[in-house]
């Protein structure tokens, strides 16, 4: 089988979960993005690309629910995993605290333009969404945005940049993703894999 693993904060926990299910992940050469052991092949990808790889043919992947929601990829999601817990929230400068319902005309910086647009559309609030790929929390400080939508774990990064959380959009955790065709073609193998993960993680 082919597995796609996310770079960054979910990587080590993803390997642990696979190994609990009996999938041995061989040591990766530092520069290798694809590696394997003859039985399974592993691909290392940007977290935002994992659902896309799974939708388009990689058998199994692990990604945050934030990324899956943002991408809207058509994948089978059999399990929520017990790591990667955080939240996607709206934050503003601490001296300009405003509820989302009063953000009409605001510029919002985020890596999550689709989720952000949907959230404010549901509130009937018109905002301008500015897509950035990193250091989102700097946008209000340098004057290019009035607020941000970003992942919050402890809130330390927000505080150190003079920002406060004003609303939670969604809770986030890691998800197991399965390609829909693979799920049918390798039903027994994938079902056994899912069962092993569920038992090792949740005990049932």
From Swiss-Prot:
**What protein name applies here?**
ATP phosphoribosyltransferase
One GO process term, biological-process aspect: L-histidine biosynthetic process
Give the organism the record lists.
Pyrococcus furiosus (strain ATCC 43587 / DSM 3638 / JCM 8422 / Vc1)
Please verify whether the record's keywords include Nucleotide-binding. yes
The reaction(s) catalysed by this protein are: 1-(5-phospho-beta-D-ribosyl)-ATP + diphosphate = 5-phospho-alpha-D-ribose 1-diphosphate + ATP
Q: Which family is this sequence assigned to?
A: Belongs to the ATP phosphoribosyltransferase family. Short subfamily.
| PANTHER family listed in its UniProt record | ATP PHOSPHORIBOSYLTRANSFERASE, ATP PHOSPHORIBOSYLTRANSFERASE ATP-PRTASE
Role: Catalyzes the condensation of ATP and 5-phosphoribose 1-diphosphate to form N'-(5'-phosphoribosyl)-ATP (PR-ATP). Has a crucial role in the pathway because the rate of histidine biosynthesis seems to be controlled primarily by regulation of HisG enzymatic activity.
Q: Known EC number(s)? A: 2.4.2.17
- Report the GO terms under cellular component: cytoplasm
Question: Hey, which pathway is this one from?
Answer: Amino-acid biosynthesis; L-histidine biosynthesis; L-histidine from 5-phospho-alpha-D-ribose 1-diphosphate: step 1/9
Q: Which InterPro entries match?
A: ATP_PRibTrfase_cat, ATP_PRibTrfase_CS, ATP_PRibTrfase_HisG, ATP_PRibTrfase_HisG_short
Q: Return the NCBIfam families for the record.
A: hisG
UniProt keywords, alphabetically? Amino-acid biosynthesis, ATP-binding, Cytoplasm, Glycosyltransferase, Histidine biosynthesis, Nucleotide-binding, Transferase
Per UniProt, subcellular location reads as: Cytoplasm
